């Protein structure tokens, strides 16, 4: 954690972000850093039952109040890995994903390990949890709409809608022939 006050944060830690925003930055990754002198909201840690100050990734104070409202950032906010210990061992993925979205995150990064097609059920459970949170009001639909619009604007700005359509099955088969070839599997075992 960082013990900076709000004034210190604005004078030091936030300066590179403010400059990036002034220069047209389109995406910012949030960090799982705690600022207990600035963020007062906390949860009870799953790990040791202590008071756990929300890290910036889960903090509406940081992502909405400071980043968007004070600094004027209109781009996409993506999390660092949601599997990192600062999140997974203290908050847990279900609550953390909801808190992050409500804080202002647009894209959740690495919510679970996906090492094979068998792991698809883990991703489905995460998606189902978020859908359920929207349906029961824990995440406002407007919050999802805001993120969707920001991500679509970014894709448009990057020209991703102008790219020719690809044959997904052929692309997957090609990737598997490269990634899954015997030579690469042998190298993987050595590493």
Region annotations inferred by a language model:
Residues 24, 74, 104-106:
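Glycine-enriched alpha-helix->loop->beta-strand junction motifs that scaffold or abut catalytic
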Residues 28-30, 75-80, 108-110, 151:
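Hydrophobic faces of well-ordered beta-strands that scaffold small-molecule active sites
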Residues 51-78:
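Alpha-helix-loop-beta-strand connector modules within alpha/beta enzyme cores
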Residues 8, 12-27:
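Phosphate/pyrophosphate-binding betaalpha-module
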